[in-house]
């Protein structure tokens, strides 16, 4: 016999049943991509946002994280407590700058590439300036 809930959520041809989460759904623990001092900051498949007061170092910190995410080894220079999972598969890394002018964004972009030892932008890195 089908319960009211099962009947209500029965697949009606729109194909959403495979997306439904139940208490019995087996969920794998998230894979940490960025950790600081052993605490998970970002996990695979999620968006990471950095916020803070003006001139608090957000852009510099973002550049460090992005350069480590672009690297093949995930090494972050001079920051022993910061771990970024190595990007050995060249998974997409997106950077959206909503604050800086294009010249400043370009300078930061070059700094990111330099920090991780790249001479040119890899195909898996999208760096976008959204300041209007």
Predicted regions and their residues:
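N-terminal pre-Walker A segment at the start of P-loop NTPase domains
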Residues: 6-37
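Conserved inter-motif catalytic segment of the P-loop NTP-binding fold
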Residues: 16, 77-80, 86-132
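Phosphate-binding P-loop
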Residues: 39-45, 85-88
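Short hydrophobic/aromatic beta-strand immediately N-terminal to the Walker A/P-loop
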Residues: 48-51, 94
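The conserved Walker
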Residues: 54
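Conserved glycine(s) of the Walker
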Residues: 57-58
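Hydrophobic positions on the alpha1 helix immediately C-terminal to the Walker A/P-loop
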Residues: 61-65
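Gly/Ala-rich phosphate-binding loop of Rossmann-like dinucleotide-binding domains
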Residues: 70
């Amino acid at each position: 016999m089908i319960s009211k809930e099962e009947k209500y959520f029965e697949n009606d041809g729109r194909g959403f049943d495979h997306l439904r989460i139940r208490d019995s759904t087996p969920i794998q623990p998230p894979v940490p991509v960025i950790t600081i001092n052993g605490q998970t900051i970002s996990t695979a498949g999620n968006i990471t946002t950095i916020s803070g007061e003006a001139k608090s170092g957000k852009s510099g910190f973002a550049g460090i994280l992005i350069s480590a995410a672009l690297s093949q080894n995930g090494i972050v220079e001079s920051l022993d407590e910061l771990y970024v999972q190595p990007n050995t598969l060249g998974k997409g890394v997106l950077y959206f700058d909503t604050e800086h002018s294009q010249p400043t964004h370009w300078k930061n972009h070059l700094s990111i590439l330099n920090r991780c030892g790249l001479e040119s932008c890899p195909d898996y890195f999208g760096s976008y300036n959204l300041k209007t």
